[in-house]
A protein has these predicted regions:
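Classical Sec-dependent N-terminal signal peptides that target proteins to the secretory pathway
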Residues: 1-20
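Metabolite-binding pocket within alpha/beta catalytic cores that recognizes anionic/polar moieties
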Residues: 18-165
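Generic structural signal for well-ordered, non-membrane alpha-helical segments
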Residues: 47, 51-54, 94-98, 155, ...
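Flexible, glycine/charged-enriched surface loops at secondary-structure junctions
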Residues: 63-70, 174-181, 266-267
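Active-site rim beta-loop-alpha module in soluble metabolic enzymes
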Residues: 153-204
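Generic non-transmembrane alpha-helical segments
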Residues: 165-173, 219, 258-266
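A C-terminal functional module that forms or caps the active site or interfaces directly
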Residues: 195-234
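His/Asp/Glu-rich mid-to-C-terminal helical/loop segments that flank catalytic regions of hydrolases
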Residues: 237-267
Length: 267
C-alpha cells in the first residue's frame, strides 16, 4: 500500500521546527502518576485507554511481561514481543489523562515512541465497523494547545517515522483494504446535546471521533519524540451501528498486532 504524505509531512516538519528545544521539560522518575523506576519502560510504549486492556495485551502478546506501574489502577507492563522490548500501559480517557501519561513517559522515562491503540466512532460512509484508522493528523475542539502559548493554531500530526513503519506492516499483513490513513477529531466531550456537530467534521475529510490523539501528538512534538494513533472503528455514528463488548475484544486484537509489529520494526 502506497500513500501520499506530503501535506501531512509539511505539518510534521513545521511542528518539529516550532518545538525543537524540549530540554527544559526533563525530570526524574518516579512521577506523581507513575511509580516505576528509571529504565522500567521500553523505548516504545503502547497506550490503550483501559487498564484491563493493558493487562490483556501483556498477558496474551508479550513474553516475560512484568508489572511496572499500578498507581490509581493504571497498570503498566514491560515485556518482549518477538525479542524486542515493548511496554504497554493504560492512558485513561480523554486528553487531560493522555496528556499526563504521555508527558511523563516522554520526559521522565525517556520513551521515544508512543502508539495509542483504542476505539473510534466513524463519521463517514466509506468507513466500516472494524476498520483500523491510522491518524495522520488530529483536529480538536479542545483548548489543549493553549498550554503551549503559541500565537496561532497548531496541527496535531503523527510522526513520519511511525507512519512509514506502520504502512510497511499493513502491507506485509495484507490489510490494505481494512486500514485507512487520514484525519481524526479528538473531542473534549463524549456526551453532547448537538451530536450532529461531530458529523460536520466529515465535510473536512475527518474519518472519525475519539478523545485522546491530539494531546498525544502535541506532547510528542514538544518533546521531540514520536507518536502515532491507531484506532479500531467500534461505533458508526451515521449508521447507528455498534460492536458488542465481545466483538470489540476480538476486533481489537488485529490493531494490537499491527501496533506490536510496528514496535518490533522500530528496533
Amino acid at each position: 500500500m502506497k500513500i501520499v504524505l506530503l501535506p501531512f509531512l509539511y505539518l510534521i516538519l513545521s511542528s518539529t521546527i516550532c518545538f525543537e528545544l524540549p530540554g527544559d521539560q526533563k525530570f526524574e522518575p518516579p512521577t506523581p502518576h507513575i511509580n516505576a523506576p528509571k529504565g522500567a519502560f521500553a523505548k516504545t510504549v503502547l497506550l490503550p485507554g483501559d487498564p484491563k486492556r493493558a493487562r490483556y495485551i501483556a498477558e496474551k502478546f508479550l513474553q516475560d511481561a512484568k508489572l511496572v506501574n499500578d498507581i490509581r489502577g493504571v497498570q503498566g507492563y514491560t515485556g518482549y514481543y518477538k525479542g524486542v522490548r515493548v511496554s504497554v500501559m493504560a492512558s485513561g480517557m480523554g486528553m487531560p489523562s493522555m496528556g499526563i501519561y504521555s508527558y511523563e513517559l516522554f520526559n521522565a522515562y525517556d520513551v521515544d515512541n508512543i502508539i495509542r491503540i483504542g476505539s473510534i466512532g466513524a463519521i463517514r460512509e466509506d468507513i466500516n465497523l472494524r476498520d483500523i484508522i491510522v491518524a495522520l493528523s488530529a483536529s480538536t475542539n479542545s483548548n489543549y494547545a493553549s498550554n503551549f502559548n503559541i500565537n496561532g493554531i497548531i496541527s496535531g500530526s503523527a510522526s513520519y517515522k511511525l507512519i512509514k513503519k506502520v504502512d510497511e506492516v499493513v502491507e506485509k499483513m495484507g490489510l490494505q483494504n481494512k486500514v485507512k490513513f487520514g484525519q481524526i477529531l479528538s473531542s473534549d466531550t463524549f456526551y453532547t446535546d448537538e451530536k450532529e456537530n461531530d458529523l460536520k467534521w466529515a465535510k473536512m475529510g475527518v474519518m472519525g471521533v475519539e478523545m485522546e490523539g491530539y494531546s498525544l501528538y502535541l506532547n510528542a512534538a514538544r518533546a521531540g519524540k514520536n507518536a502515532l494513533v491507531l484506532t479500531t472503528v467500534s461505533d458508526h455514528l451515521i449508521r447507528k451501528e455498534y460492536l458488542t463488548g465481545e466483538e470489540r475484544q476480538y476486533s481489537f486484537d488485529e490493531m494490537v498486532i499491527v501496533a506490536l509489529e510496528t514496535a518490533a520494526e522500530l528496533n
